[in-house]
């Protein structure tokens, strides 16, 4: 409230600055060794004129040979479904998440079925991934997730997981079945965190690779004496003014260097993908 008792956001428009980036982990590019696995993450972002912003990050299962396919399909699919839902309900807290989940599963199943092979095998190979995202509307902000990952609200990170046997829940286990869901059926559904947007300055979501990013604050960029610094720096203006700044920051952290005859990998062993937003009013 201001001195007149009027909320400071009344009569002002929500404005969310967005930055996003993804880099493959060193365990995927395997510096100095003749092997390669694709970046298995996917992300999608949508911003509307009213300021409403949606972001989704999907992290493909490392055991899936081509799980990046499902992750990169699911992220924009889920963003589109949320856009459709918000067009009817306006406020994020009124979204019906069981319907959203079922619609996403149905769309992914349509694609998987068209691939013309054993459906269970197709899902295991292509469509196992974790999901985390945020919705920012003028009224409220929702963090939503199935599986592990990291979300950051007003600079404070929250790590989701780890899960028993290092086996996070994947959305498409709803089709294949899994001991993960047998142990805890609630893991098959989106979990939610709600905030009043007027109380937020920043929000971010990322895959579990962001945990490694958080642990690197005291280390130096490979081949330099420059300290990486705290993760909070990515919410400062330079990372939003230059759309490539965040990607370059992650890429510098994962640059491989030569030490004599040995190749030293970068600092991020897992694929690292995140979307961050600074929240303001104009």
Per-range role (PLM):
Residues 20-37, 109-122, 153-198, 252-260:
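PP2C/PPM family metal-dependent serine/threonine protein phosphatase catalytic domain
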Residues 77-111, 222-252:
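Helix-loop-helix
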Residues 1-80, 149, 182, 266-275:
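N-terminal entry segment of metal-dependent catalytic domains or homologous docking segments
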Residues 90-152, 187-197, 260-269, 277:
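Catalytic core of PPM/PP2C metal-dependent serine/threonine phosphatase domains
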Residues 65-67, 153-155, 213-216:
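Short helix/loop capping segments that flank catalytic or ligand/cofactor-binding pockets
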Residues 2, 183-282:
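C-terminal catalytic subdomain
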Residues 69-73, 158-159, 218-225:
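Short Gly/aromatic-enriched secondary-structure transition segments
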Residues 55-58, 144-146, 204-206:
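Short hydrophobic beta-strand that contains or immediately precedes a catalytic carboxylate
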């Amino acid at each position: 409230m201001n001195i007149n008792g009027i909320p400071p956001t009344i009569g002002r428009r929500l404005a969310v600055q967005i930055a996003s980036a993804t880099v493959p982990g060193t365990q995927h590019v395997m510096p100095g060794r003749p092997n390669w696995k694709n970046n298995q993450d996917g992300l999608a972002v949508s911003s509307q004129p009213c300021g409403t912003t949606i972001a989704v990050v999907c992290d493909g299962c490392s055991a899936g040979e081509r799980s990046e396919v499902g992750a990169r399909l699911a992220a924009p699919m889920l963003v589109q479904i949320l856009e459709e839902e918000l067009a009817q309900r306006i406020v994020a807290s009124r979204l019906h998440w069981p319907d959203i989940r079922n619609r996403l599963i149905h769309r992914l199943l349509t694609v998987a079925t068209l691939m013309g092979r054993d459906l269970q095998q197709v899902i295991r190979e292509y469509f196992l991934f974790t999901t985390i995202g945020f919705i920012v509307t003028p009224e409220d902000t929702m963090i939503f997730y199935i599986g592990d990952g990291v979300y950051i609200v007003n600079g404070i990170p929250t790590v989701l997981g780890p899960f028993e046997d290092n086996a996070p829940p994947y959305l498409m286990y709803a089709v294949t079945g899994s001991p993960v869901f047998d142990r805890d059926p609630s893991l098959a559904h989106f979990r939610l965190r709600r905030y009043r947007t007027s109380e937020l300055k920043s929000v971010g979501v990322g895959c579990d690779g962001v945990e490694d990013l958080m642990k690197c604050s005291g280390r130096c960029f490979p081949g330099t004496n420059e300290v990486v610094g705290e993760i909070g720096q990515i919410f400062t203006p330079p990372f939003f003014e230059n759309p490539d700044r965040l990607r370059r920051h992650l890429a510098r952290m994962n640059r491989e260097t030569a030490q004599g005859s040995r190749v030293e990998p970068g600092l991020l062993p897992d694929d690292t993908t995140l979307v961050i937003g600074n929240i303001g009013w104009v």
